[in-house]
Amino acid sequence: MQSKFLWIAAASAATAAAQVPARLCGTAQPTMDDLVIAAGLAAEGKDNRRGLHPEDPIVVPTLFHVLAINETVAGGYLTEKSLQDQLDVMNADFGPSNVIFNLTATTRTVNRRWAQDLDEIPMRRALRQGGQETLNIYFMPYVSGYLGYCTFPNFWDAGSDEFIYDGCAVLSDSLPGGSLARYNLGRTATHEIGHWFDLFHTFSGGCGCVGDMIHDTPAMLNATGGCPVGKDTCPDRPGLDPIHNYMDYSDDACMNEFTPGQNFRMRSAWYNIRTK
């Protein structure tokens, strides 16, 4: 299953460059298969906490694939500095979770269709490297109208379309220093990689008992816009909305944490699915 971020320019009389986008979810709730896998990871983790090696860092082989319309920054041809800044944000955000991203290669492809998020499977068959333990991120100037999307882990057959599709697509303008106001600190990649580690949105399930299937993320009815401190959309449930969580939809500057329960889920997904 993939998770997509939809961004829509705010309606105003201002110029397009001055418009501030809103971040909206463009994805259905996790499938039953995703929920079953998440429940299994939770159960496995409770029975085998030591087997998850919490003291050992998870080192993720990572590849950056730059897809561009032409060899200009506006066309998606990102600079080495932008890519390094994005990698630094990823490692800083996941550092407290004891996760390290080791960039093993960067590819650059000028292809108008691929840069516009078309011909996804042929593109990924040409570029994707490694197994399910390898994170392939595709940066492109247009992601079908979204900020990004990624896949949850699953037990796919090597070489299948699902296996080839595994990875994340991220809008070029969302990298640190990009042109997308409020969403240009690199946190789109952080959020999407959370999905790659089997994390759901914090607002999944609303105020229901199951929620995002993480015990220490407070329930929330809907996604967050901006950074509204004190937001509480489930007043009958413990805690305020986790607006600072990377798996909400707050502004990039508002995001700063994963919970211990989310860290545990990521580690469980890594050892029980991604490195199996």
Curated annotation (Swiss-Prot):
Keywords: Disulfide bond, Glycoprotein, Hydrolase, Metal-binding, Metalloprotease, Protease, Secreted, Signal, Zinc. It is found in: Secreted. The active site is at residue 192. The keyword Secreted applies. GO terms for cellular component: extracellular region. One of its GO terms (biological process) is proteolysis. It is an enzyme of class 3 (hydrolase). The keyword Metal-binding applies. GO terms for molecular function: metal ion binding; metallopeptidase activity. Zn(2+) binds at residues 191, 195. CDD domains: ZnMc_pappalysin_like. InterPro entries: MetalloPept_cat_dom_sf (IPR024079), Peptidase_M43 (IPR008754). Secreted metalloproteinase that allows assimilation of proteinaceous substrates. Belongs to the peptidase M43B family. This is Extracellular metalloprotease VDBG_07883. It comes from Verticillium alfalfae (strain VaMs.102 / ATCC MYA-4576 / FGSC 10136).
